[in-house]
Amino acid sequence: MTMMKRIFLLFAAVVMAAGVASAQDINKAIEAANNGNEAFQMGEYGLAIDAFKNSLAIAESLGEQGVEHANTCKTAICNIYLAFSKNLIKAADLDAALAKLSETISVSEGYGNAETAESAKELIPQVYMQKGNTALKAKDMAGAIEAYNKVIELDPNNGDALLRLGQAYAASGQFESAVASYETAAANGKELAAKKQLSTLFLKKAQASLKAGNNQEVIENALKANSYLENANAYKLAASAAQKLKNNAQCIEFYEKYLELKPNAKDAAGVTFTIAALYQQDGNKAKAIENYEKVAADPQYGPGAQEQLAVLKK
């Protein structure tokens, strides 16, 4: 049932109550309620609330005879407050919407209307989520973090808010907070998306470590990235770092995983040639031959591979 129909029916109840009170007073109450209903239909929520509050005051002055009328007005007032809040949300006037929802809850609880109060409470996390999304899109990470944290405060298991909070933390350089948010999101229905973000996060950290010359950290972060979601580029970074550390076994392992995940990579021939050379350095003749043969016909690496094959096959 639409809000307009609900208000109309409530107004009808007001009219039905007219016969039990003094004609003059009840007519004033009906007129005020009618004005409120008309204002509501025109979207003049503030005027509608004032009119129904006026009608309520008249009803309450009638004592026992005005109880039904008063209850009708209270229900109408609560519903108008909620409709006002929803209209502000629709208009993306989110701060005003939050303030109006707070009023809705206060008024509804004061009038004993638990249902409307609960409806308003359910909307608050949605409004904060909308605020967070708007801030994230505008690259206002501080605003996004604040809004998403409010969502989580009200709805701790909201996987979407946790995931986007992780994105905001990551974009603002708050690495540990981003990891914590993503991991909590993964535990709340967003496992695939969260693990993808975690893998990317640690891959970027591995890239930063490579630029800083911290090769052991490169390997650690690349492997951490792959613990969430295997990524060919993470293995390539780890292989590069292992080669600089002169750890041939690790370098071979990582390069082989890289080619396993990305067999048609543009640098596949070069990586295969490197693997062959590393096996050759380690004295593994069979593996060296196997890999040199893979690139023996390559325009760039073929001549070098054939030269080494001639040596190895003597």
Name each region found by the language model.
Residues E68-H69, C73-A76, A83, L123, ...:
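Canonical tetratricopeptide repeat
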